[in-house]
């Protein structure tokens, strides 16, 4: 879709804005400032010199998304690519970087696999998630490898107040059933959150039905999440965080069943300990462990096991009211066992330092000038030393309620264990590197309305790609630039409209676009709340044309429409109803891979103390 075709949409939106904003003031709701943990400190979103999106628990419940991948689809600057139906590998691209350039963390614990370097966002259900933080742009000075394009931090729910319990059930198309139980609260000196969920579906074919596929690929998923914490006095806190998920998927032929299958198990465990040394110095020690066991038969047994052990020691030092430091060190060991190919491991030691200067104008109640500088040194036992740095700044204009932000950063992605140790490995392959720049603004239009725009430009070199013999080589250069635009409007009568557009132009050294990444993506969401009882949502998602299979094939652009409703029948009972792909669009995100047609789901949530 060409940009000129989008111009009328933005013109109409801006004209309507002036009409609606004044009358919308009657519905003002003051919200608490949102904080972002993925920046290694509880920094308010409005102060960050980065492009950030926070998806809250309220957003998740309103959309009724079942997985993290579903809630991420259409998010600003994010491209979600599913390789088939329920349970198939789901990759996430940001700013045209490969999926191993997007770091996934669960409660601040790294979740990317050591073997392939990426994370499957379609594997994690949303039942026990409190919020999702999307930080676009390089974050390597804080997180090292895998954060070249950004970080997606999944924060699980934390208990508070009187123990509350809930039971949820949903059923719908493709013989799909979902059940979940959740309990959270505070008992004596402990706060806890516990959730378990089950998902079963007969699904649809991995191969596109409109290309002739008739069979169905069944899938089931069981997930358990647990968080237990205690404040030790007034200055210490200890938490235990555990997440376990197992999925079973049938791989079938296009027209008949067979015995192919894939079983995946994921475990993430962390034991963060926080201590306030004094009023200006906090310490956080986080040992964590991640495990993945993937067993595939298509035919023949292909089993892969990933293990990752990390110990992170972080210090937050508030030197003055205006100057703060984040510094520490991290040790990480990754192991992979491919039972038909290799066994390998790598170790990484790192030290990091980020300094923030938040200037207070004596003539203003606002801190309207922020400077930040970051440095990180990584030592990898296979390829040696690597240094990354980042400079950023933000400026706030109180008179116009406008905030500007900009940053320049370097980043890298380590070769994966597959690159270094598999049967077609290359022990001489080195890290991919990048340099990136971004500039953006956030204009508050009213209490419920704002406009966000960020321009970015990235250049990457030594990109790892397979040569003609399927051997990984540092051979490619990649260029990416784009504009991320989001407009949120608080309309009269409790309506809210959110419009977003991501334009991302990308190409390699031969001027070819990168595969499976659309140049244009548009999302529009209209929500309404009626007498605090009925929440309604109608969403439109447009994805442009994309290349596939080494630029030899293409997937066409498509438009999908969805709707979701939640009715508060009583203080204890909520009824839900949603419909997906209301236009029954026949489309593909990956060439020849199936996607769901028109479908509907209904359910309920019962809450009690």
PLM segments and residue spans:
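Structural signature of Gram-negative outer-membrane beta-barrels, strongest in the C-terminal barrel
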Residues: 233, 278, 320-324, 334-336, ...
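Extracytoplasmic beta-strand/coil segments of soluble accessory domains associated
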Residues: 69-109, 113, 130
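Outer-membrane beta-barrel signature, preferentially recognizing the C-terminal barrel domain
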Residues: 256-276, 304, 403, 407-491, ...
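Periplasmic-side early beta-strands and strand-to-turn transitions of outer-membrane beta-barrels
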Residues: 141, 153, 160-162, 170, ...
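Short acidic/polar hinge/loop motifs at secondary-structure boundaries
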Residues: 109-136
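Short, acidic, small-residue-rich periplasmic hinge/interaction motif at the N-terminus
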Residues: 24-61, 99
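N-terminal periplasmic accessory domains that precede
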Residues: 68-71, 88-93, 120-125, 134, ...
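Gram-negative outer-membrane beta-barrel transporters
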Residues: 359-365, 455-459, 474-550, 568, ...
């Amino acid at each position: 879709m060409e940009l000129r075709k989008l111009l009328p949409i933005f013109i109409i939106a801006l004209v309507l804005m002036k009409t609606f904003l004044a009358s919308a003031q009657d519905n003002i709701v003051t919200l608490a400032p949102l904080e972002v943990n993925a920046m290694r400190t509880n920094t308010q979103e409005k102060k960050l010199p980065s492009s950030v999106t926070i998806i809250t628990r309220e957003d998740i419940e309103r959309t009724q998304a079942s997985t993290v991948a579903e809630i991420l689809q259409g998010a600003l600057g994010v491209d979600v690519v599913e390789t088939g139906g329920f349970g198939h590998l789901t990759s996430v691209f940001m700013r045209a970087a490969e999926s191993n350039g997007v770091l996934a963390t669960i409660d601040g614990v790294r979740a990317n696999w050591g073997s392939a370097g990426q994370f499957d966002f379609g594997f994690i259900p949303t039942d026990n998630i409190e919020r999702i933080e999307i930080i676009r742009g390089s974050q390597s000075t804080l997180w090292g490898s895998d954060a070249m394009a950004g970080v997606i931090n999944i924060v699980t729910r934390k208990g508070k107040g009187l123990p509350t319990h809930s039971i949820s059930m949903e059923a719908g198309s493709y013989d799909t059933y979902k059940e979940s139980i959740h309990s959270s609260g505070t008992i004596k000196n402990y706060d806890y959150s516990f959730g378990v969920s089950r998902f079963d579906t007969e699904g649809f074919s991995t191969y596109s039905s409109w290309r002739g596929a008739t069979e169905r690929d069944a899938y089931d998923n069981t997930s358990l999440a647990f968080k237990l914490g205690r404040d030790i006095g007034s200055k210490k806190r200890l938490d235990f965080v555990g997440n376990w998920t197992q999925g079973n998927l049938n791989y079938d032929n296009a027209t008949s069943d067979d015995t192919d299958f894939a079983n995946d198990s994921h475990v993430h465990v962390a034991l963060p300990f926080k201590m306030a040394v004094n009023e200006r110095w906090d310490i956080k020690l986080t040992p964590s462990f991640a495990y993945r066991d993937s067993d595939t038969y298509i035919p023949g047994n292909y089993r892969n096991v990933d293990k990752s052990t990390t110990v992170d020691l972080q210090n937050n030092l508030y030197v003055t009211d205006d100057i703060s430091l984040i510094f520490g060190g991290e040790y990480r060991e990754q192991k992979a066992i491919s039972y038909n190919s290799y066994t390998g491991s790598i170790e990484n030691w790192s030290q990091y330092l980020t300094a923030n200067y938040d200037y207070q104008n004596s003539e203003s109640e606002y801190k309207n000038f922020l400077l930040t500088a970051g440095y990180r040194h990584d030592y990898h036992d296979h390829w040696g030393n690597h240094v990354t740095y980042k400079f950023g700044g933000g400026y706030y204009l109180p008179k116009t309620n406008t905030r500007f932000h900009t940053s320049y950063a370097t980043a890298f992605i380590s070769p994966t264990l597959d690159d270094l140790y598999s049967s077609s490995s290359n022990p001489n392959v080195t890290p991919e590197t990048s340099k990136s720049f971004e500039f953006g603004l956030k204009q508050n239009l009213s209490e419920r309305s704002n406009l966000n725009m960020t321009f970015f430009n990235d250049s990457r070199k030594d990109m790892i790609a397979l040569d003609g013999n399927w051997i990984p080589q540092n051979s490619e250069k990649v260029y990416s630039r784009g504009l991320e635009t989001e407009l949120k409007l608080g309309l009269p009568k409790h309506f809210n409209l959110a419009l977003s557009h991501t334009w991302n132009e990308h190409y390699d050294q031969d001027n070819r676009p990168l595969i499976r990444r659309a140049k244009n993506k548009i999302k529009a969401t209209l929500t309404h709340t009626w007498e605090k009882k009925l929440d309604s949502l109608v969403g439109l998602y447009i994805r442009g044309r994309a290349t596939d299979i080494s630029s030899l094939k293409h997937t066409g652009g498509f438009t999908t429409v969805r709707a979701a409703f939640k009715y508060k029948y009583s203080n204890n009972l909520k009824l839900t109803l949603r419909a997906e792909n209301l236009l029954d669009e026949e489309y593909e995100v990956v060439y020849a891979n199936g996607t769901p047609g028109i479908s509907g789901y209904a359910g309920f949530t019962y809450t009690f103390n």
